[in-house]
């Protein structure tokens, strides 16, 4: 917890520009298919009202994962304040085999102790499956809540939780001197802040694997340029500003390289920069357009979009040489892939029959599953644990962000109130 807090502390310098017009998750479908679980309101041991609804945040996290269906508070059979007070039979009668209880205690120095216990109410009734406690200041109460959610999620699923992650995205606001804003928020839309404002378009944010930097495209110089911005101090490093197009940045998983697309010789082609030396080498060539690189876990291979067969399809290439290999065959066209951190599957924009949706492809079998049902879906980005995808779609006259689970069962929206939202990018674990 302490190490994670140190990583997150780097964002505090930007929180002076936290916005009130935040995105919030609105669930559309799929919760009923999740595993039932009980999350009891955390017991508050101080005067007045609790400073944060920790239990509510944990319940929302588990619900937002698409894998759990927390029991509504009005239906809770009891509200125990500790593991010892849990009556397993009352919960198992409702089909619930695990319950989260917790306590929040104020300290004289203004900090808070947050504790939780995950209690088995099924197989081994009354057994504490997981527990932890954290001492945090008020501004870190949501972070402590997400930490508890991560631990509960991992204990019950075997999958590392991703509730302490963030998302970056571009908002085109409704006028003003700087209508384009690169923003970052918690994964659930809270604690939104502005990373960069611009009078010209901003595009394609990409996270460094340690979560400390964002690469993105800016047009502030009158033409496209690739830059890397350090979030802790705002320092900006220009990476590429060649004639014509500079775009689609992607950090390698080992953090040593940045892949991107340039059209300085005519057609779009892929290039890779060694970030330590600044040396750039070309990966693809020819007359076709090659763009939208995404890395495989080995930091040696890229999936990318190419129109070399006529329509856009996804190909794989080794950055050290060799011919690209086509890896998508279903649908009229496929593009803008994002490979999972374990290299087992990818998500992409797949078009067929006039529809453009987010699809998942198994990289071993080639099997494809359409995940989304929204309109003109684009720019999918995977959560670091591979369980969820965030993407943008058209709604009315604008663009909004959407979430879908990688099994396709859970769908939600993150509507913004002050502009169109595009180019979402899910952070690594923070």
Curated annotation (Swiss-Prot):
What residue stretch is flagged as signal peptide?
1-21
Give a Pfam family name.
PD40
**Assembly notes:** The Tol-Pal system is composed of five core proteins: the inner membrane proteins TolA, TolQ and TolR, the periplasmic protein TolB and the outer membrane protein Pal. They form a network linking the inner and outer membranes and the peptidoglycan layer.
Recorded superkingdom: Bacteria
- Give the UniProt record's GO annotations in the biological process aspect: cell division; protein import
Organism name:
Shigella dysenteriae serotype 1 (strain Sd197)
Which keywords annotate this record?
A: Cell cycle, Cell division, Periplasm, Signal
Q: Which InterPro entries match?
A: 6-blade_b-propeller_TolB-like, PD40, Tol-Pal_TolB, TolB_N
The UniProt entry's sequence similarity note says:
Belongs to the TolB family.
Among the entry's GO cellular component annotations, what is one? periplasmic space
Provide the protein name. Tol-Pal system protein TolB
Locations listed in the record: Periplasm
Q: What does this protein do?
A: Part of the Tol-Pal system, which plays a role in outer membrane invagination during cell division and is important for maintaining outer membrane integrity. TolB occupies a key intermediary position in the Tol-Pal system because it communicates directly with both membrane-embedded components, Pal in the outer membrane and TolA in the inner membrane.
């Amino acid at each position: 917890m302490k190490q994670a807090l140190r990583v997150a502390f780097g964002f505090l310098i930007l929180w002076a520009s936290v916005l009130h017009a935040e995105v919030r998750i609105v669930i559309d479908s799929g919760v009923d298919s999740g595993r039932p679980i009980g999350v009891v309101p955390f017991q508050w041991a101080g005067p007045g009202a609790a400073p944060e609804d920790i239990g509510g945040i944990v319940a929302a996290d588990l619900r937002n994962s698409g894998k759990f269906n927390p029991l509504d508070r009005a239906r809770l059979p009891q509200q125990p304040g500790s593991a010892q007070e849990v009556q397993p039979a009352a919960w198992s009668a409702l089909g619930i085999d695990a319950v989260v209880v917790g306590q929040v205690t104020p300290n004289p120095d203004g900090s808070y102790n947050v504790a939780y216990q995950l209690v088995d109410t099924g197989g081994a009734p009354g057994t504490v499956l997981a527990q932890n406690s954290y001492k945090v200041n008020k501004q870190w109460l949501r972070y402590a809540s997400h930490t508890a959610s991560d631990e509960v999620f991992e204990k019950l699923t075997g999958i590392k939780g991703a509730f302490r992650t963030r998302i970056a995205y571009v908002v085109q606001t409704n006028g003003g001197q700087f209508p384009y804003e690169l923003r970052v928020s918690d994964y659930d839309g809270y604690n939104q802040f502005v990373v960069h404002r611009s009078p010209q378009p901003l595009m394609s944010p990409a996270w460094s694997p340690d979560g400390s930097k964002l690469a993105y495209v800016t047009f502030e110089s009158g033409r496209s340029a690739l830059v890397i911005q350090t979030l802790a101090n705002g320092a900006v490093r220009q990476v590429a500003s060649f004639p014509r197009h500079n775009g689609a940045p992607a950090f390698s998983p080992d953090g040593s390289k940045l892949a991107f697309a340039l059209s300085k010789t005519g057609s779009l082609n892929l290039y890779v920069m060694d970030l330590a030396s600044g040396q750039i080498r070309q990966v693809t060539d020819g007359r076709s357009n090659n763009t939208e690189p995404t890395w495989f876990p080995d930091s040696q291979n890229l999936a990318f979009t190419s129109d070399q067969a006529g329509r856009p399809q996804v190909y794989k290439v080794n950055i050290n040489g060799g011919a690209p290999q086509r890896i998508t065959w279903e649908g009229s066209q496929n593009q803008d892939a994002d490979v999972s951190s374990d290299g087992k599957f990818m998500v992409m924009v797949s078009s067929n029959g006039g529809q453009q949706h987010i699809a998942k492809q198994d990289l071993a079998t080639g099997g494809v599953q359409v995940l989304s049902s929204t309109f003109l879906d684009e720019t999918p980005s995977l959560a670091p644990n591979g369980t969820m995808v965030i993407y943008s779609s058209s709604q009315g006259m604008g663009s909004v962000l959407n979430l879908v689970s990688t099994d396709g069962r859970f769908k939600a929206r993150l509507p913004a109130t002050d502009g169109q939202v595009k180019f979402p990018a899910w952070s690594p674990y923070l």
